[in-house]
Amino acid sequence: MTETYDIAIIGGGFSGIAVLANIVRAASQPLSLVVISRDEPHIYGPAYSTPRPEHLLNVRAEGMGLFDTDHKGFYDWAAARDSSIKPGDYLPRRLFAEYLTAIRQKTLETAQQKNISIRFMRAEAEDIRPGTQLTLVTDKGDIHAADIVLAIGNTLKAKEDAQSEPRLVTDVWHYDYAALAGAKNIKSIAIVGSGLTALDSIISLLNCGWTGQMTCLSGGAQLPKAHPPVYDKTKLKAADRAHFVGQRPSRIMHELRKSARGADWHYAIDALRPFTQDIWKAFSAPDRLRVAQRYFNLWNLHRHRCDASIRAQADKAIAGGTLEMVQARCTSFHADAAGVDVMLKRDGHDETRRFDLVFKCIGVNYAVANNPLITKLIKKGLLAPADNPFGIAADAAFRAYDGAGGVIHALGTPLFGHLFETTAVPDLRHQAARVAADVIALREGALRSRAAGAGE
Protein backbone atom coordinates (compact mmCIF):
# COMPACT_ATOMS: atom_id res chain seq x y z
CA MET A 1 0.00 0.00 0.00
CA THR A 2 1.35 3.42 -1.03
CA GLU A 3 1.59 5.95 1.80
CA THR A 4 0.80 9.62 1.20
CA TYR A 5 2.43 12.64 2.85
CA ASP A 6 2.50 16.36 2.20
CA ILE A 7 6.30 16.46 2.30
CA ALA A 8 9.02 13.83 1.95
CA ILE A 9 12.57 14.68 3.01
CA ILE A 10 15.31 12.45 1.63
CA GLY A 11 18.19 12.53 4.09
CA GLY A 12 18.35 12.48 7.86
CA GLY A 13 21.65 14.29 8.35
CA PHE A 14 22.13 17.95 9.24
CA SER A 15 20.38 19.18 6.07
CA GLY A 16 17.36 16.94 6.54
CA ILE A 17 16.95 17.77 10.23
CA ALA A 18 17.39 21.48 9.50
CA VAL A 19 14.65 21.45 6.85
CA LEU A 20 12.35 19.45 9.14
CA ALA A 21 12.92 21.73 12.13
CA ASN A 22 12.37 24.88 10.07
CA ILE A 23 9.15 23.55 8.54
CA VAL A 24 7.70 22.55 11.90
CA ARG A 25 8.77 25.79 13.55
CA ALA A 26 7.13 27.97 10.89
CA ALA A 27 4.05 25.92 9.95
CA SER A 28 0.63 27.29 10.87
CA GLN A 29 -1.42 24.40 9.45
CA PRO A 30 -1.35 20.64 10.09
CA LEU A 31 1.05 18.78 7.80
CA SER A 32 2.31 15.25 7.29
CA LEU A 33 6.02 14.62 6.75
CA VAL A 34 8.27 11.62 6.27
CA VAL A 35 12.06 11.65 6.61
CA ILE A 36 13.78 8.90 4.62
CA SER A 37 17.32 7.93 5.56
CA ARG A 38 19.47 4.83 5.21
CA ASP A 39 20.62 5.42 8.81
CA GLU A 40 18.90 5.40 12.18
CA PRO A 41 17.25 8.74 13.16
CA HIS A 42 20.07 9.66 15.58
CA ILE A 43 22.79 9.30 12.89
CA TYR A 44 23.51 12.61 11.16
CA GLY A 45 26.02 11.58 8.52
CA PRO A 46 29.51 10.05 8.82
CA ALA A 47 31.42 13.02 10.22
CA TYR A 48 28.87 13.85 12.93
CA SER A 49 28.46 10.21 13.95
CA THR A 50 32.03 9.94 15.22
CA PRO A 51 32.22 8.92 18.90
CA ARG A 52 35.78 10.23 19.27
CA PRO A 53 36.34 13.36 21.42
CA GLU A 54 39.40 14.44 19.40
CA HIS A 55 37.32 14.83 16.22
CA LEU A 56 36.45 18.51 16.42
CA LEU A 57 34.20 20.85 14.52
CA ASN A 58 36.06 23.24 12.24
CA VAL A 59 33.68 26.13 12.90
CA ARG A 60 33.57 28.02 16.20
CA ALA A 61 30.75 27.01 18.55
CA GLU A 62 29.13 30.43 18.24
CA GLY A 63 28.59 29.88 14.51
CA MET A 64 27.12 26.37 14.50
CA GLY A 65 23.47 27.02 15.36
CA LEU A 66 20.97 25.10 13.23
CA PHE A 67 18.58 28.00 12.65
CA ASP A 68 19.46 30.90 10.35
CA THR A 69 17.90 33.26 12.89
CA ASP A 70 19.97 31.89 15.77
CA HIS A 71 23.61 31.34 14.80
CA LYS A 72 24.61 30.98 18.46
CA GLY A 73 22.06 28.28 19.18
CA PHE A 74 24.59 25.47 19.48
CA TYR A 75 26.87 27.53 21.73
CA ASP A 76 23.99 28.52 24.01
CA TRP A 77 22.88 24.87 24.27
CA ALA A 78 26.44 23.64 24.96
CA ALA A 79 27.27 26.41 27.46
CA ALA A 80 24.10 25.65 29.41
CA ARG A 81 25.52 22.15 29.94
CA ASP A 82 29.12 23.25 30.58
CA SER A 83 29.82 26.83 31.66
CA SER A 84 33.53 26.50 30.76
CA ILE A 85 32.69 26.42 27.04
CA LYS A 86 33.53 29.66 25.22
CA PRO A 87 31.97 31.05 22.01
CA GLY A 88 35.24 30.63 20.09
CA ASP A 89 35.81 26.99 21.05
CA TYR A 90 36.00 24.22 18.46
CA LEU A 91 33.97 21.52 20.14
CA PRO A 92 33.77 17.74 19.58
CA ARG A 93 31.51 16.73 16.72
CA ARG A 94 29.89 14.08 18.90
CA LEU A 95 28.61 16.94 21.10
CA PHE A 96 27.15 18.59 18.02
CA ALA A 97 25.33 15.34 17.24
CA GLU A 98 23.79 15.50 20.72
CA TYR A 99 22.64 19.04 19.94
CA LEU A 100 21.00 17.83 16.72
CA THR A 101 19.23 15.10 18.69
CA ALA A 102 17.95 17.74 21.12
CA ILE A 103 16.70 19.82 18.17
CA ARG A 104 14.99 16.75 16.70
CA GLN A 105 13.28 15.96 20.01
CA LYS A 106 12.10 19.56 20.41
CA THR A 107 10.83 19.49 16.83
CA LEU A 108 8.79 16.34 17.52
CA GLU A 109 7.26 17.96 20.61
CA THR A 110 6.36 21.11 18.67
CA ALA A 111 4.91 19.01 15.84
CA GLN A 112 2.63 17.20 18.26
CA GLN A 113 1.33 20.52 19.59
CA LYS A 114 0.65 21.73 16.02
CA ASN A 115 -0.99 18.50 14.83
CA ILE A 116 1.90 17.82 12.43
CA SER A 117 2.67 14.15 11.86
CA ILE A 118 6.29 13.06 11.34
CA ARG A 119 7.55 9.61 10.44
CA PHE A 120 11.21 8.57 10.29
CA MET A 121 11.64 5.79 7.74
CA ARG A 122 14.84 3.80 7.31
CA ALA A 123 14.99 3.19 3.57
CA GLU A 124 16.95 3.89 0.38
CA ALA A 125 15.43 6.37 -2.08
CA GLU A 126 15.69 4.85 -5.56
CA ASP A 127 13.58 6.95 -7.93
CA ILE A 128 10.99 9.72 -8.25
CA ARG A 129 8.09 9.50 -10.71
CA PRO A 130 5.90 12.49 -11.70
CA GLY A 131 2.12 12.17 -11.94
CA THR A 132 -0.91 13.64 -10.21
CA GLN A 133 1.44 13.53 -7.22
CA LEU A 134 5.14 12.82 -7.04
CA THR A 135 5.89 9.19 -6.24
CA LEU A 136 9.06 8.50 -4.30
CA VAL A 137 10.23 4.94 -4.91
CA THR A 138 12.17 3.37 -2.03
CA ASP A 139 13.40 -0.13 -1.29
CA LYS A 140 10.66 -0.31 1.38
CA GLY A 141 7.77 0.78 -0.86
CA ASP A 142 6.36 3.80 -2.68
CA ILE A 143 5.45 7.15 -1.13
CA HIS A 144 3.23 9.86 -2.60
CA ALA A 145 4.17 13.45 -1.74
CA ALA A 146 3.40 16.89 -3.09
CA ASP A 147 6.89 18.13 -2.20
CA ILE A 148 10.12 16.18 -2.05
CA VAL A 149 13.29 17.66 -0.56
CA LEU A 150 16.67 16.31 -1.61
CA ALA A 151 18.77 16.73 1.55
CA ILE A 152 21.10 13.89 0.72
CA GLY A 153 24.36 15.21 2.12
CA ASN A 154 27.88 14.19 1.19
CA THR A 155 28.83 11.16 -0.89
CA LEU A 156 32.26 10.00 0.22
CA LYS A 157 34.75 9.03 -2.50
CA ALA A 158 36.00 6.14 -0.42
CA LYS A 159 32.53 4.58 -0.55
CA GLU A 160 32.81 4.13 -4.32
CA ASP A 161 35.08 1.13 -3.88
CA ALA A 162 34.65 0.42 -0.19
CA GLN A 163 35.98 -3.01 0.71
CA SER A 164 35.57 -5.20 3.75
CA GLU A 165 39.32 -5.78 3.92
CA PRO A 166 40.47 -5.26 7.53
CA ARG A 167 43.69 -3.64 6.28
CA LEU A 168 41.89 -1.09 4.08
CA VAL A 169 39.78 1.27 6.20
CA THR A 170 37.10 3.50 4.68
CA ASP A 171 35.21 4.51 7.84
CA VAL A 172 37.90 6.38 9.74
CA TRP A 173 35.46 7.74 12.34
CA HIS A 174 34.47 4.40 13.88
CA TYR A 175 37.74 2.53 13.60
CA ASP A 176 39.05 0.91 16.80
CA TYR A 177 42.20 3.01 17.17
CA ALA A 178 42.81 1.73 20.70
CA ALA A 179 43.48 -1.74 19.28
CA LEU A 180 46.54 -0.35 17.47
CA ALA A 181 48.37 0.55 20.68
CA GLY A 182 49.55 -3.01 21.22
CA ALA A 183 49.49 -4.21 17.60
CA LYS A 184 53.03 -5.41 16.87
CA ASN A 185 52.19 -6.24 13.24
CA ILE A 186 51.08 -2.67 12.39
CA LYS A 187 54.20 -0.55 11.99
CA SER A 188 53.36 1.49 8.89
CA ILE A 189 50.09 3.25 8.07
CA ALA A 190 49.19 5.18 4.93
CA ILE A 191 46.61 7.96 5.03
CA VAL A 192 45.27 8.53 1.52
CA GLY A 193 44.16 12.14 1.22
CA SER A 194 45.22 15.23 3.15
CA GLY A 195 42.00 17.07 3.97
CA LEU A 196 39.97 17.36 7.15
CA THR A 197 39.09 13.64 7.13
CA ALA A 198 42.79 12.78 6.93
CA LEU A 199 43.42 15.05 9.91
CA ASP A 200 40.81 13.10 11.87
CA SER A 201 42.79 9.90 11.27
CA ILE A 202 46.15 11.49 11.99
CA ILE A 203 44.98 12.97 15.29
CA SER A 204 43.37 9.70 16.39
CA LEU A 205 46.56 7.79 15.56
CA LEU A 206 48.65 10.29 17.50
CA ASN A 207 46.34 10.01 20.52
CA CYS A 208 45.80 6.25 20.69
CA GLY A 209 49.27 5.19 21.84
CA TRP A 210 50.40 3.75 18.50
CA THR A 211 54.05 4.61 17.75
CA GLY A 212 54.61 3.56 14.13
CA GLN A 213 55.23 5.52 10.93
CA MET A 214 52.46 7.44 9.15
CA THR A 215 52.64 8.39 5.48
CA CYS A 216 50.13 10.85 4.06
CA LEU A 217 49.63 10.39 0.30
CA SER A 218 47.84 13.05 -1.75
CA GLY A 219 48.18 15.07 -4.92
CA GLY A 220 48.93 18.27 -3.03
CA ALA A 221 50.58 16.81 0.07
CA GLN A 222 49.28 19.74 2.12
CA LEU A 223 47.13 19.59 5.23
CA PRO A 224 44.34 22.14 5.86
CA LYS A 225 45.52 25.46 7.23
CA ALA A 226 44.77 26.34 10.84
CA HIS A 227 42.35 28.93 12.13
CA PRO A 228 43.99 31.75 14.12
CA PRO A 229 44.42 30.63 17.76
CA VAL A 230 42.12 33.51 18.69
CA TYR A 231 39.77 34.87 16.05
CA ASP A 232 39.87 38.68 16.11
CA LYS A 233 36.66 39.89 14.49
CA THR A 234 37.98 43.46 14.36
CA LYS A 235 40.41 42.31 11.64
CA LEU A 236 37.56 41.12 9.41
CA LYS A 237 37.01 44.03 7.03
CA ALA A 238 34.34 44.07 4.33
CA ALA A 239 35.78 43.26 0.90
CA ASP A 240 34.89 45.39 -2.13
CA ARG A 241 32.36 43.24 -3.96
CA ALA A 242 33.11 44.90 -7.31
CA HIS A 243 36.74 43.75 -7.13
CA PHE A 244 35.64 40.10 -7.06
CA VAL A 245 32.17 39.45 -8.48
CA GLY A 246 32.27 39.32 -12.28
CA GLN A 247 36.06 39.05 -12.42
CA ARG A 248 38.13 36.26 -13.96
CA PRO A 249 39.76 33.73 -11.57
CA SER A 250 43.23 35.18 -12.19
CA ARG A 251 42.02 38.67 -11.26
CA ILE A 252 40.39 37.36 -8.10
CA MET A 253 43.64 35.67 -7.07
CA HIS A 254 45.44 38.98 -7.63
CA GLU A 255 42.90 40.86 -5.49
CA LEU A 256 43.13 38.26 -2.73
CA ARG A 257 46.91 38.50 -2.60
CA LYS A 258 46.63 42.29 -2.50
CA SER A 259 44.09 42.12 0.35
CA ALA A 260 46.33 39.81 2.36
CA ARG A 261 49.51 41.82 1.78
CA GLY A 262 50.74 43.16 5.10
CA ALA A 263 47.75 41.64 6.88
CA ASP A 264 46.48 38.26 8.09
CA TRP A 265 45.36 36.16 5.10
CA HIS A 266 42.69 34.38 7.19
CA TYR A 267 40.56 37.52 7.28
CA ALA A 268 41.10 38.28 3.57
CA ILE A 269 39.66 34.85 2.72
CA ASP A 270 36.81 35.13 5.21
CA ALA A 271 35.83 38.56 3.87
CA LEU A 272 34.69 36.84 0.66
CA ARG A 273 32.14 34.66 2.44
CA PRO A 274 29.12 36.98 1.98
CA PHE A 275 29.42 36.77 -1.80
CA THR A 276 31.48 33.66 -2.62
CA GLN A 277 28.45 32.08 -4.30
CA ASP A 278 27.94 35.23 -6.38
CA ILE A 279 31.58 35.09 -7.51
CA TRP A 280 31.03 31.50 -8.61
CA LYS A 281 27.78 32.20 -10.44
CA ALA A 282 29.34 35.15 -12.29
CA PHE A 283 32.09 32.95 -13.74
CA SER A 284 31.66 31.64 -17.26
CA ALA A 285 30.92 27.91 -17.50
CA PRO A 286 34.51 27.15 -18.62
CA ASP A 287 35.89 29.16 -15.68
CA ARG A 288 33.66 27.30 -13.22
CA LEU A 289 34.93 23.99 -14.52
CA ARG A 290 38.54 25.20 -14.44
CA VAL A 291 38.26 26.46 -10.86
CA ALA A 292 36.59 23.24 -9.68
CA GLN A 293 39.24 21.06 -11.28
CA ARG A 294 42.38 23.11 -10.67
CA TYR A 295 41.85 25.40 -7.68
CA PHE A 296 39.24 23.74 -5.47
CA ASN A 297 41.78 21.95 -3.27
CA LEU A 298 43.77 25.17 -2.82
CA TRP A 299 40.58 27.00 -1.84
CA ASN A 300 39.61 24.25 0.60
CA LEU A 301 43.00 24.37 2.33
CA HIS A 302 42.56 28.05 3.12
CA ARG A 303 38.78 28.35 3.51
CA HIS A 304 37.85 25.15 5.37
CA ARG A 305 40.44 25.24 8.11
CA CYS A 306 41.02 23.28 11.31
CA ASP A 307 41.45 24.21 14.96
CA ALA A 308 44.97 25.49 15.62
CA SER A 309 45.61 22.80 18.26
CA ILE A 310 44.84 20.04 15.72
CA ARG A 311 47.22 21.47 13.14
CA ALA A 312 49.91 21.93 15.81
CA GLN A 313 49.79 18.21 16.66
CA ALA A 314 50.14 17.28 12.99
CA ASP A 315 53.01 19.74 12.47
CA LYS A 316 54.83 18.31 15.49
CA ALA A 317 54.48 14.81 14.01
CA ILE A 318 55.87 16.02 10.67
CA ALA A 319 58.82 17.77 12.35
CA GLY A 320 59.56 14.67 14.42
CA GLY A 321 59.45 12.33 11.44
CA THR A 322 56.40 10.39 12.66
CA LEU A 323 54.30 11.74 9.78
CA GLU A 324 55.64 11.88 6.23
CA MET A 325 53.87 13.99 3.59
CA VAL A 326 54.20 12.49 0.09
CA GLN A 327 52.93 14.13 -3.10
CA ALA A 328 51.49 11.27 -5.13
CA ARG A 329 48.25 10.10 -6.70
CA CYS A 330 46.97 6.69 -5.61
CA THR A 331 45.69 4.71 -8.59
CA SER A 332 44.74 1.38 -7.00
CA PHE A 333 44.98 -0.77 -3.89
CA HIS A 334 45.57 -4.48 -3.35
CA ALA A 335 44.85 -5.69 0.17
CA ASP A 336 45.69 -9.06 1.65
CA ALA A 337 45.77 -10.51 5.14
CA ALA A 338 49.12 -8.91 5.97
CA GLY A 339 48.86 -5.43 4.45
CA VAL A 340 48.07 -3.29 1.42
CA ASP A 341 50.01 -2.59 -1.78
CA VAL A 342 49.31 0.99 -2.87
CA MET A 343 49.93 1.79 -6.53
CA LEU A 344 51.04 5.40 -6.99
CA LYS A 345 51.74 7.96 -9.68
CA ARG A 346 54.63 10.03 -8.39
CA ASP A 347 56.65 12.53 -10.42
CA GLY A 348 55.23 10.98 -13.58
CA HIS A 349 56.34 7.47 -12.65
CA ASP A 350 54.50 4.40 -11.40
CA GLU A 351 55.45 3.23 -7.94
CA THR A 352 54.17 0.63 -5.49
CA ARG A 353 54.48 1.00 -1.74
CA ARG A 354 53.56 -1.54 0.91
CA PHE A 355 51.81 -0.58 4.16
CA ASP A 356 50.51 -2.59 7.07
CA LEU A 357 47.31 -0.55 7.14
CA VAL A 358 45.65 2.06 4.90
CA PHE A 359 43.07 4.70 5.82
CA LYS A 360 41.19 6.08 2.81
CA CYS A 361 40.40 9.72 3.60
CA ILE A 362 39.72 11.08 0.13
CA GLY A 363 36.71 13.16 1.00
CA VAL A 364 33.55 14.12 -0.84
CA ASN A 365 32.73 13.25 -4.45
CA TYR A 366 30.67 16.06 -5.95
CA ALA A 367 30.28 14.40 -9.35
CA VAL A 368 26.67 13.75 -10.35
CA ALA A 369 27.73 10.37 -11.74
CA ASN A 370 28.54 9.18 -8.22
CA ASN A 371 24.95 9.54 -7.01
CA PRO A 372 22.59 6.92 -8.51
CA LEU A 373 19.38 8.78 -7.60
CA ILE A 374 20.50 12.14 -9.01
CA THR A 375 21.88 10.44 -12.14
CA LYS A 376 18.57 8.65 -12.74
CA LEU A 377 16.51 11.82 -12.28
CA ILE A 378 18.70 13.76 -14.72
CA LYS A 379 18.44 11.00 -17.34
CA LYS A 380 14.66 11.08 -16.98
CA GLY A 381 14.64 14.86 -17.44
CA LEU A 382 13.16 15.43 -14.01
CA LEU A 383 16.23 17.38 -12.86
CA ALA A 384 18.51 19.61 -14.92
CA PRO A 385 22.28 19.29 -14.51
CA ALA A 386 24.45 22.26 -13.69
CA ASP A 387 26.68 23.46 -16.52
CA ASN A 388 29.48 21.30 -15.10
CA PRO A 389 29.66 17.68 -13.85
CA PHE A 390 29.27 18.64 -10.20
CA GLY A 391 25.58 18.96 -9.44
CA ILE A 392 22.13 20.06 -10.48
CA ALA A 393 20.47 23.37 -11.26
CA ALA A 394 17.94 25.07 -8.98
CA ASP A 395 16.18 28.42 -8.81
CA ALA A 396 16.38 31.08 -6.09
CA ALA A 397 13.91 29.14 -3.91
CA PHE A 398 16.03 25.99 -4.34
CA ARG A 399 13.42 24.36 -6.55
CA ALA A 400 15.13 21.79 -8.77
CA TYR A 401 11.83 20.60 -10.30
CA ASP A 402 8.47 22.34 -10.50
CA GLY A 403 5.99 20.47 -12.65
CA ALA A 404 3.57 17.58 -12.84
CA GLY A 405 2.72 16.27 -9.40
CA GLY A 406 4.62 18.74 -7.26
CA VAL A 407 7.99 20.30 -6.48
CA ILE A 408 11.44 18.90 -5.78
CA HIS A 409 13.68 21.13 -3.66
CA ALA A 410 17.40 20.54 -3.21
CA LEU A 411 20.07 21.82 -0.86
CA GLY A 412 23.65 21.06 0.07
CA THR A 413 25.97 18.80 -1.89
CA PRO A 414 23.79 18.37 -5.02
CA LEU A 415 24.08 22.13 -5.59
CA PHE A 416 27.90 22.26 -5.54
CA GLY A 417 28.14 22.89 -9.28
CA HIS A 418 25.51 25.62 -8.98
CA LEU A 419 26.73 27.40 -5.82
CA PHE A 420 30.27 26.14 -5.01
CA GLU A 421 30.13 26.92 -1.27
CA THR A 422 27.22 24.76 -0.20
CA THR A 423 28.26 22.18 2.40
CA ALA A 424 29.21 24.13 5.55
CA VAL A 425 26.65 24.61 8.32
CA PRO A 426 26.30 28.40 7.72
CA ASP A 427 25.36 27.70 4.07
CA LEU A 428 23.12 24.73 4.85
CA ARG A 429 21.08 26.43 7.56
CA HIS A 430 20.37 29.37 5.21
CA GLN A 431 19.31 26.99 2.44
CA ALA A 432 17.19 24.95 4.86
CA ALA A 433 15.34 28.08 6.00
CA ARG A 434 14.67 29.13 2.39
CA VAL A 435 13.52 25.65 1.39
CA ALA A 436 11.24 25.38 4.42
CA ALA A 437 9.67 28.79 3.75
CA ASP A 438 8.92 27.86 0.14
CA VAL A 439 7.57 24.43 1.08
CA ILE A 440 5.22 25.96 3.65
CA ALA A 441 4.06 28.66 1.22
CA LEU A 442 3.27 26.00 -1.38
CA ARG A 443 1.51 23.62 1.02
CA GLU A 444 -0.50 26.26 2.86
CA GLY A 445 -1.37 27.92 -0.45
CA ALA A 446 -2.66 24.57 -1.71
CA LEU A 447 -4.72 24.12 1.46
CA ARG A 448 -6.28 27.58 1.05
CA SER A 449 -7.10 26.87 -2.60
CA ARG A 450 -8.67 23.56 -1.65
CA ALA A 451 -10.75 25.23 1.07
CA ALA A 452 -11.87 28.00 -1.29
CA GLY A 453 -12.88 25.42 -3.90
CA ALA A 454 -14.88 23.47 -1.36
CA GLY A 455 -16.77 26.59 -0.37
CA GLU A 456 -17.95 27.48 -3.87
Model regions and ranges:
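Flavin (primarily FAD) cofactor-binding/catalytic cores of flavoenzymes
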Residues: T2-E40, P46, S83-A242, M253-L447, ...
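N-terminal glycine-rich dinucleotide-binding loop that anchors FAD/FMN and/or NAD(P) in oxidoreductases
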Residues: S49-G73, D232-R248, S309-A312
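Active-site-adjacent bridging/hinge elements
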Residues: F74-A78, V407-A410
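Extended, charge-rich low-complexity interaction segments
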Residues: D68-W77, S250-K258, L419
